[in-house]
């Protein structure tokens, strides 16, 4: 018996669309630009599908087309596709610029929010009490330790990436263990980055593990 239980949220609907129309909707990597008016095509194709409502479908489509990986895929020379993956009209310069601006604003909002949350967390951390005068005096009476040996020269600090400026095919280094490893960015999301090492291995890492 076919499952007719309604899909509960946009994430489930997008996963269903990927399964139903694999030549159009992509689960990982850069998404394909969708045909203008594709919502109407979806509504017609899924008219008899009890699992999807038009309201939820519209919301899921909006989420899919505003995702970073979808906006990353809107480039010059790319053609929009229909539900069966057939190419149609090429993207216009206006649509490409709009996608770049939307991507930039979305990244700025996300990383500004993260910086604010980090500052608030630091402010909530209890401060260590200042040492009492008696303790300070006692410490000053202790014999001074012998001078330490000159420190060994340390390499220049690694430069952390600006997550808001990361883009596909950009060269970075991934901090794995003691030394960074060269890699190439393959996908950027709100939470992490997918990179490919020189060995061909694909990894998904957090922004704080990337350096230049």
Curated annotation (Swiss-Prot):
Q: Could you tell me which Pfam families the record lists for this protein?
A: ProQ, ProQ_C
A single GO cellular-component term on record = cytosol
Compartmental location: Cytoplasm
The entry's keywords: Chaperone, Cytoplasm, RNA-binding
**UniProt cross-references to SUPFAM superfamilies, sorted A to Z:** FinO-like
Q: Name one GO biological process term.
A: post-transcriptional regulation of gene expression
By its UniProt entry, which Gene3D superfamilies does this protein fall under?
ProQ/FinO domain (1.10.1710.10)
Region annotated Disordered, chain positions = 102-149
Biased composition (Basic and acidic residues) is annotated at 102-124, 132-144
Give an example GO molecular function: RNA strand annealing activity
Q: Which family does it belong to?
A: Belongs to the ProQ family.
Which NCBIfam families does its entry note? PRK04950.1
Q: What does this protein do?
A: RNA chaperone with significant RNA binding, RNA strand exchange and RNA duplexing activities.
Q: What is this protein called?
A: RNA chaperone ProQ
């Amino acid at each position: 018996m076919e499952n007719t239980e309604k899909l509960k949220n946009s994430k489930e609907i997008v996963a269903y669309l990927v399964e139903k129309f694999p030549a159009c909707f992509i689960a990982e990597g850069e998404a394909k630009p969708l045909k203008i008016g594709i919502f109407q095509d979806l509504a017609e194709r899924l008219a008899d599908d009890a699992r999807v409502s038009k309201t939820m479908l519209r919301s899921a489509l909006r989420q899919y087309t505003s995702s970073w990986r979808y906006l990353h895929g809107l480039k010059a020379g790319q053609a929009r596709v229909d539900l069966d993956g057939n190419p149609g009209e090429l993207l216009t310069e206006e649509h490409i610029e709009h996608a770049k601006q939307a991507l930039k604003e979305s990244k700025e909002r996300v990383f500004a929010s993260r910086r604010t949350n980090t500052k608030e967390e630091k402010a909530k951390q209890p401060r260590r009490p200042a040492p009492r005068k008696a303790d300070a005096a006692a410490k000053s009476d202790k014999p001074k330790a012998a001078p330490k040996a000159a420190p060994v020269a340390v390499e220049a600090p690694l430069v952390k990436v600006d997550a808001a400026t990361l883009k596909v095919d950009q060269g970075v280094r991934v901090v794995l263990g003691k030394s960074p490893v060269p890699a190439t960015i393959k996908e950027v999301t709100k939470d992490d980055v997918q990179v490919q090492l020189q060995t061909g291995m694909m990894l998904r890492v957090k922004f704080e593990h990337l350096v230049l």
